[in-house]
Amino acid sequence: MEQYLQLCEHVLQNGSPKSDRTGTGTISVFGYQMRFDLEKGFPIVTTKKLHMRSIIHELLWFLKGDTNIRYLQENGVRIWNEWADENGDLGPVYGKQWRSWEGANGKTVDQITEVVEQIKTNPNSRRLIVNAWNVAEIEEMALAPCHCLFQFYVNDGKLSCQLYQRSADIFLGVPFNISSYALLTMMMAQVCGLKPGEFIHTFGDAHLYNNHIEQTKLQLTRKPKQLPTMHINPEVTDLFAFTYDDFELKHYDPYPHIKAEVSV
């Protein structure tokens, strides 16, 4: 995936040293965009192996509106363990905001259900937006939303999605985010009777942690391989009816995994 490697190169060459919340330190740029044509293969990094199982289960977990890691742990996914409390709770993170945003008037809004309905009935709307950045509840979240707002766009029978990510851990987080939102776009397109268009990934603070620099340089020595394809069970027409077994990533032949520590 050349787009991702170009991002890595850009930050290594142009990034500025910055301190950060975790105390690890980063090199960072502000403002960057990548585009992926979903008809040209499923966008997943091939220059290191990713755990697609974790990506799928995390996305299904978001869509359930769940904010406890029990479901993830039961399915062998550990990516949220460091932030959960002793009961496995994370506070009102992504799933809560996507499915049951609480407004100041006390009304609860299911943003995902509403945006699906709007895509079907009013596809030219410029309000096809889901927002996870609920200012009133940020302090209650174990981790403030990094990928915080996404918007859909319908044109020529195709559904595209643009994500705004305020904070992007380029080595560990971004590869997951690319594949997760690409998959969400494909799922949304299917249930809305559309074809997948583009996934556009826009960043605010895009950074490499100081303890990921050598791993990133190693990855840049590897030549990207052909993108795999994602098969989605065509019989599923309800976004919330998808299960793990409805997805099959075909012809994924990545280089070996590269270990790196997560900054908490």
From Swiss-Prot:
The keyword Ribonucleoprotein does not apply. The keyword Transferase applies. The active site is at 146 (nucleophile). Its main location: cytoplasm. Keywords: Cytoplasm, Methyltransferase, Nucleotide biosynthesis, Transferase. GO terms for cellular component: cytosol. It is found in: Cytoplasm. It catalyses: dUMP + (6R)-5,10-methylene-5,6,7,8-tetrahydrofolate = 7,8-dihydrofolate + dTMP. Catalyzes the reductive methylation of 2'-deoxyuridine-5'-monophosphate (dUMP) to 2'-deoxythymidine-5'-monophosphate (dTMP) while utilizing 5,10-methylenetetrahydrofolate (mTHF) as the methyl donor and reductant in the reaction, yielding dihydrofolate (DHF) as a by-product. This enzymatic reaction provides an intracellular de novo source of dTMP, an essential precursor for DNA biosynthesis. This is Thymidylate synthase. HAMAP family: Thymidy_synth_bact. Pathway: Pyrimidine metabolism; dTTP biosynthesis. It comes from the Bacteria. It comes from Shouchella clausii (strain KSM-K16) (Alkalihalobacillus clausii). One of its GO terms (biological process) is methylation. It is an enzyme of class 2 (transferase). Belongs to the thymidylate synthase family. Bacterial-type ThyA subfamily. Homodimer. DUMP binds at residues 21, 126-127, 166-169, 177, 207-209.
